[in-house]
Amino acid sequence: MHTIQMSIYVLGLLVALALIFDFMNGFHDAANAIATVVSTGVLKPQTAVAMSAVFNFVAIFTVGVHVATTVGKGTVDPSVVDHYVVFGALVGAIIWNVVTWYYGIPSSSSHALIGGLVGAAVAKSGTGALVGSGLLKTVIFIVVSPLMGFVLGSVVMLIVSWVFVRSTPRKVDTWFRRLQLFSAAAYSLGHGGNDAQKTIGIIWMLLIVAGVTAPTATEPPLWVIISCYTAISLGTLFGGWRIVKTMGQKITKLKPVGGFCAESGGAITLFVATAAGIPVSTTHTITGAIVGVGSAQKASAVRWGVAGNIVWAWIFTIPASAFMAAIAWWIGKHIL
């Protein structure tokens, strides 16, 4: 990978911007990890946020950096990446996150970042800047991750319903109010493990381009890993409350047993994707799982209109953030 001349101030600005995105990722996507456990009344919002923040950070000790490698080297051609491309990608993703947070739309921070990278790279060098195989893997999992969440959420719900068929509703509720603490923790662990790595990949790519880190390095610097996990944990701690209601109650009404099944299905999907180095959307995953839980009870339990609006937000995320990133790239060329 080529290196470019970059002042320490510009490098510092871009690293700070990446950490701001990571903070906003935690802030924006906090609802994914806590919405079910809050909406079922198992935990109070403040307690749920604190628990989620802790497990987002703990993920640093439990997963590798496979996702960071995909984002840093497998989405766009590293030879076209410079500080302008990174600036455009981050600004485009941040703007889309702010817009969707303001309107309470549970869109994907992950795909906003991928879209930002694509838009800025194409603005600089055309479509030849894209790594087709890596981008295809990401696009495929836009569909696969919510489907996996849907299937696993519904299967777990059906199994649980069969196992506890003779139990009283009160007994089931008591059991799953406890079990949901574990499933919520597992989902937060999966969220931190997959999502923080996307920003690690961006900063790693930036450091290689600036000549600070060797392009042959197999892992990013330790300070990058710690900084990114800290930023996403702090973002989670402050939480994006506008989205909690949509995720927790508007799609389908959840009880503790449903919350447990949705979080379990979502967590399994995230762990599998992270192990495979695939940057999936935690938003897509938990939404699919929630819909799966609702439909396992009965199709009418799902508010399909709300689910449809969320799908439209997913479809527009990559092109919208790519468009904003292309504009930000052009602006960055004139101010950095």
Annotate each predicted stretch with a short phrase:
Residues 1-336:
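Multi-pass alpha-helical transmembrane bundle typical of ion/small-solute transporters
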